[in-house]
Each structure stands twice: as structure tokens, then as C-alpha cells.
Amino acid sequence: MGWSWIFLFLLSGTAGVHSEVQLQQSGPELVKPGASVKISCKASGYTFTDYNMHWVKQSHGKSLEWIGYIYPYNGGTGYNQKFKSKATLTVDNSSSTAYMELSSLTSEDSAVYYCAR
């Protein structure tokens, strides 16, 4: 039996009004079912610790789903109950980077993921 694969496409967006605000995400990932993946979102153009970083999922043909947020200043998090056991949000303030780790991946996790300020 051949391997199955899960494709995760990562994009970034921001609600910021200043054009210099940028969020740069890691690239697309192709991973095996059951594996984990950690994706990154590097921020620039604003004070990283001043704003929540949100993560959103969009499966093909479906509406956006909010996964959760992290407040870089103190590491506080809030999760959509649906994703509480799937996603883990962390930050590295020294590099102004937010991370989302997705665990125990299945075909249901194949989607576009966004980070957003």
C-alpha cells in the first residue's frame, strides 16, 4: 500500500492599516498522516508583543475557521474548542515569530492556514 500525504498550504494576512506591516509564513508542507508539523509566521513593521496573533484555517470549498490566538507579550492563548487538541500556539519574541504546531495530522487537516494580526 502506498503512502498517503497531507498537503498544508500556508498564507499570511494582516488587518493592519500600515503598509509596512508584514507577516511572512513558512512555505507549503507535504506531510504523512499521523505526523506533526510546525509552521511559522514572522512579523515585521510593528511591535510584535503589542498585538495578538491569530491563526485561521480554510479547507477547500469551506468557510474560514478560527483556530486560536496567542498574545506574544505574556504567551496567553485562546483556542476554538474544536482545535484545542490539534493546534499548539507559541511565540519567540526575540525573532518576532509566531508558531502553530498541528499534531496527529489526517486528511481533514489538508487546508490553507493563515496567520493574521
From Swiss-Prot:
Domain of life: Eukaryota
GO biological process: adaptive immune response
Domain Ig-like: 20-117
GO cellular component, one term: extracellular region
Signal peptide positions on this chain: 1-19
Keywords assigned by UniProt, alphabetized: Adaptive immunity, Immunity, Immunoglobulin, Signal
Keyword Signal included in the entry's annotation: yes
Pfam families: V-set
Designated name of the protein: Ig heavy chain V region 108A
